[in-house]
Amino acid sequence: MAAAHHTRPPLTLPQAFLVALFISPLLSGCGGDSDGNGHDTSTGKVNALGISGLSYQTASQSGKTNAYGQFQYYPGETLSLRVGDLLIAEGVPAQEWVTPLEFSPDTRAQLATPSVDDEGLSTHTITEQQLITRIPVTNLVRFLIALNWTENVREGTGIEIRNRVIQQLNAALPNLTNPIDFTVSETEFNAGGNNPSPANQLLAAICFYPEGDELCEEPPTEDAINNAPERPENDEDWDPDVDYKQDLQAKRQRILEAIRSMEEVDAEDARRYLTRELNAITTIVGNRFYLDNYIARHSDADTSIKQVQIRRIGGSAELSDVEAITTRPQDVALHSYNWQTANVEYFVAGLAGGESEIVISFAPEKTYRWVRKTLRVVIID
């Protein structure tokens, strides 16, 4: 017998509409048939909260991802993504949601095969969590986080790669000792000191402060510091037009501390960020669907076949697969489930006072993700 599945009741239709309204900023522009300018392109998005400033290219569309991380495409096209002149992904199927897990053919292929959880139902989340530990994925995500304008990507915000960062990145790319390789070990990707990794060479050439800020200047050299006069002991003897040794040392320290390094963003930071983004997409996709009932009560004398329907807010529930279990088959038994009709059939098998949960896992079309909903069935006299 399957373990009991404890969960809150699925959303009723009015609740689902409220959730849809609440998450509307995340959904802005995604999945539509139009880009809002009278064209018939579709709108996709890189991650749930977006990565802005990426250059994108499809067979027919090109541009930069906007403040929401959105891009335009026609269904069936593939997508390439760059940070300035640095290619980070190509040949990616253009679709409503694109994440770093879909940047490479290998991880894309594995996402297409769901895992099975402890209840015996298909799920994509186990596969996602396995893939986000891969070094090429974590190195790339860490690099993108390091390019965010603010030093950390706060919860509830996306990654913002500003034009100022891209301009400096493009200027520095030709001077790297080697191309950036996201497949190397974390240790090699983090290398600093006298032989910094290409990623750290690039970060050292980028100032994440407004143009003209002191922190964007070259740091005073050791020779300049050594040749500078000592600051007088008495404040009244200080000359405001003189750079004293102590001042230059402090300035050098401030500038060097402002230089970012890959060591500041570790693999756990990348996994935490990517998990948050992936879970947000799953929530958005899941909240588009609901069951036509979340609790059903049937008499123990009524053993006829019952049905629960999977529905989609604002449209038909088009599925590619569906599975279901009952947590107490001695009370409520499954009869059938069908992805084409998007329903699950069951019947009462026990006595009054018994109950069971029917746990339904289904895959909407055009996504590798699986959605889970639960129907509670109570047997009455």
Predicted regions and their residues:
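N-terminal secretory signal peptides that target proteins for export/translocation
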Residues: M1-T12
